[in-house]
Amino acid sequence: MPRFRLIVEYDGTDYVGWQRQDNGPSVQGAIEKAVLSLTGETVRVRGAGRTDSGVHARGQVAHLDLTRAWKPYTLQNALNAHLSLAGERVSILEVEEAAADFDARFSAIRRHYLYRIISRRSPLALEARRAWWVPKALDHDAMHEAAQRLLGHHDFTTFRSANCQATSPMRTLDRLDVTRTGDLIEIRASAQSFLHNQIRSFAGSLKLVGESKWTPDNLQAALEARDRKACGPVAPPDGLYFMRVDY
C-alpha cells in the first residue's frame, strides 16, 4: 500500500482546526472527504501539527496510504479539484511518494511557525483574519531582545494552555526572532515540537514588552515562574501560520 506525503496550505478561519472534530468542519476532514470522493477509500490523513481553529498553514505536512499507486502530480491535481469543488479553503501544494515508515508527525525534527502582527491605527481590511491588529506602536527591538531570553531547553509551563495534553512541559526552543517591515511585525519560532498555545502565548507576552508594559526581565521572570497565571494574554489565532516542517 503506497504512502504519500502532502504539503498543505489552508486558511484556518472557518475550520475548527486541523483535527477532525464533531463540532464543525476540520482541515483533516476536508482532505479525507476529497480522498473518499476521488478514490472511494476511507483513509486517515495524519498531519505534522494539530493547528487550532483560526490558525493558518503555508506548509503543513501530512501523509496518507492508498491502495492504488497514483502518480503524485495526478493525485495532487485530482485532490485539489475535489477540494475546490467542495468550496474548501485548502490547497495541496505538493505530493510525493514516501517511505513506508515515514510519519508526518513523528518523523519531524523541526517545526517552523510565523506569527504576524500589524501595528497601525487603521483597522485591517485586506489582512483581517490574517494577522493580529494592534492599533498602537510596538517596540520590536525590545520584543526581540526579550524573545532571546526564551531560547534553549526550559520548562514552558507558563506558556502552555491549561488544557495542554503533553506529558511534559519541557521543550527546546531553537529560534524566536522578532522583525519589522513597515507596519508588519513578524515573530518566527522554530523547535522540534511546541506545547498547546505556546507560540500564541509567546506573542501575547511579547506584545506587552513591545508596549513597554513588560521588560525583558519581566518575560524571563514569567518563564521562571512556571505558572500559567504569569503569562501575558494569549494572542488570537488569526496571526499564526504553520510554515514548514523539517525531516
UniProtKB/Swiss-Prot annotation:
GO biological process terms held by the UniProt record: tRNA pseudouridine synthesis
InterPro entries (UniProt xref): PsdUridine_synth_cat_dom_sf (IPR020103), PsdUridine_synth_TruA (IPR001406), PsdUridine_synth_TruA_a/b_dom (IPR020097), PsdUridine_synth_TruA_C (IPR020095), TruA/RsuA/RluB/E/F_N (IPR020094)
Entry protein name: tRNA pseudouridine synthase A
UniProt function note: Formation of pseudouridine at positions 38, 39 and 40 in the anticodon stem and loop of transfer RNAs.
Organism: Sinorhizobium medicae (strain WSM419)
Binding site for substrate: Y113
Molecular-function annotations in GO: RNA binding; tRNA pseudouridine(38-40) synthase activity
PANTHER family cross-referenced by the UniProt entry: PSEUDOURIDYLATE SYNTHASE (PTHR11142), TRNA PSEUDOURIDINE SYNTHASE-LIKE 1 (PTHR11142:SF0)
Active site: D52
Reaction catalysis annotation: uridine(38/39/40) in tRNA = pseudouridine(38/39/40) in tRNA
UniProt keyword Isomerase present: yes
EC number: 5.4.99.12
Keyword terms: Isomerase, tRNA processing
